[in-house]
Every structure is written in structure tokens, then in C-alpha cells.
A protein has these predicted regions:
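Short, conserved charged micro-motifs
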Residues: 30, 91-94
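Short, glycine-anchored, charge-dense loop/turn motifs used at functional sites
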Residues: 124-129
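Amphipathic alpha-helical segments
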Residues: 27-42
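Vicinal oxygen chelate
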Residues: 2-20, 38-86, 94-122, 133-136
């Protein structure tokens, strides 16, 4: 972390500020509606593009005609994650999302040996979102 703290104008080195996930989707409108269930607000930009926001998290959607969901990651030796989102209350978020009929919890809330408690959600396009919180 020391390198990140040392970056900035005084060092002559650009500092990276954040990262935004970009998901390809087959049909943007139902995908935007699905993310609204998760508490994201959406802004529709030019046709085929949207920005989703919830708190400090931002996800871009880009429509690609003929896009097909990735193969079921459950068939791979290790499940593929598309985005890893850290929250301050993973249990409350899990309860919130579990109560939604249109949301598929693809991995139940569970502690991990690397010090995080996590659960996964699969979106309409096969993208796996992991929600996590450090264990205390």
C-alpha cells in the first residue's frame, strides 16, 4: 500500500483513483431493470449504453447485438467472478437480495479462509457479482 500512498502530483507519478466494471449485455433495458432491484440507479446514455450506480459502486452496461451469456461457470474447476464488491454489512445485503424474487443467489453467504464473508449473485447475462466483507 505504500506505493499507492506515495503516488500523486508531488511524486511526478499519476495516481490511479478507481476502476469501473463494464459488462457486455444482449438487451440493455431488462438488464437495467434487474440491477434496479439490487438498488442501483441507472442513467441511460446513447442507445446501447448505461451507467449504474449504488453508493460508491459504478457498473457500465454496453449492449452488444447477439451477445450470449458466458458458459455456466459452475462447470469450470473454479467459479469465475466478474466483479468483487466490498460492503460494510454483507449480512444485511444478503438478506436484502435473498428477499428479491428475480435475483438468483448463486453462492450462499459463507466465511472464507482468506478472511472474507461472501455471497454471489448471477445477473441476467451470466455475470457473477461477489459481495464481501472482511471478517472481524
Amino acid at each position: 500500500m505504500a506505493n499507492a500512498e506515495q503516488a500523486g502530483p508531488a511524486t511526478g507519478r499519476a495516481r490511479l483513483r478507481n476502476s469501473t466494471t463494464v459488462f457486455l449485455v444482449g438487451n440493455i433495458e431488462p438488464t437495467m431493470e434487474w440491477y434496479k432491484q439490487l438498488g442501483f440507479e441507472s442513467e441511460y446514455y446513447p442507445p446501447g449504453f448505461a451507467i449504474l450506480r449504488r453508493d460508491d459502486i459504478e457498473i457500465f452496461l454496453q449492449q452488444q447485438p447477439g451477445y450470449a451469456a458466458p458458459e455456466d461457470p459452475g462447470r469450470r474447476k473454479r467459479e469465475a467472478w466478474n466483479v468483487y464488491i466490498v460492503t460494510d454489512d454483507v449480512k444485511a445485503l444478503y438478506a436484502e437480495y435473498s428477499a428479491l424474487s428475480g435475483v438468483k443467489i448463486s453462492r450462499q453467504l459463507c466465511p472464507q479462509d482468506y478472511g472474507m464473508t461472501e455471497f454471489d449473485v448471477m445477473d441476467l447475462n451470466g455475470h457473477r457479482l461477489v459481495f464481501a466483507q472482511p471478517m472481524r
